[in-house]
Curated annotation (Swiss-Prot):
Belongs to the transferase hexapeptide repeat family. LpxD subfamily. This is UDP-3-O-acylglucosamine N-acyltransferase. Catalyzes the N-acylation of UDP-3-O-acylglucosamine using 3-hydroxyacyl-ACP as the acyl donor. Is involved in the biosynthesis of lipid A, a phosphorylated glycolipid that anchors the lipopolysaccharide to the outer membrane of the cell. HAMAP family: LpxD. It comes from Polaromonas sp. (strain JS666 / ATCC BAA-500). The active site is at 246 (proton acceptor).
Amino acid sequence: MTLRLADIVQSLAPTVQAELVGNPDVQIERLSTLDAAGPHDLSFLSHPKYLAKLAQSAAACVVVAPAAREAAVSRGACIVVDDPYHYFALITQLWKYRHVLQAAPHIHPSAFIDPAATLAPGVSVGAFACISAGTVIGAGARIAEHCVIGRDAHVGAESRLSARVTVADGCYIGERCIVHPGAVIGADGFGFAPHQGQWIKIEQLGAVKIGNDVEIGANTCIDRGALQDTVLEDGVKLDNLVQIGHNVRIGKHTAMAGCAGVAGSATIGAHCTVGGGAIVLGHLSLADHVHISAASVVTRSILKPGHYTGLFPIDDNTAWEKNAATLKQLHVLRERLKQAEKSLSNIQEKS
């Protein structure tokens, strides 16, 4: 299946205005990178540092910013738009919608749906899924194979739960959310009280509340709150294998890469990013627009927007061990330097 360039631009015109330069009847067979694109492919240039690849690309058409218009026109057809990366993201959505066959709503006969559950029109439920009493599934939602939806839960309209997703009792998922395979929403938070050498379980009585347009990666876990709910606001994006502890609150449109972890009762602001493998310790607060580099450990609250890194740089092992040994002596070296500065100051005063 192909798409005409004119059809692509026209379909996206209600969202983003773009200028099509070249033959509008060119048929696009595939979306591709500049490097791999062939003569029937559509690609994009999102950053000026890749400008050299533009001239070498065999793509039938390239989405570019106004600054790259002249270079793009000199090689062939192009779509000129203010934000090429955003526009290309919209093209991928259009492409999937046009090319991926959407099955008609269907409830598999092996699925268990409690009579006290409420399913709106257009809901699909896959094989061996379980939907418990009191649960509400919104219109057009898709619940894939082996999903388990607990009692009194809520899955919003047009949300998609992939295979083997668990949504525990009382948890809420908003509209148009995407939850990838194996994610667990609403398992007990990690709460225990020490008593006479033993750990006494603190029952987790809160839930998880997830806003609209949230995407949750495969095998990500979001724990239910102890007393208050764990909350993900609208537009949050979590990669695979992310751990969100109990009572955490994550602001709108914050994104976290794979293997990031947020300990209990931390508050993450809106429009933040947390790099892969980074850790935010419990009970800390991050302001809006805070960006944490990969593998960093956040040990204090960050109240000022900006980009933060807490990571010992990689090096060959011998050099790393020497630097690590020096770092352990940093306080001693600091005190020696202060003493040397004081002695030098005394000598200068006497002279």
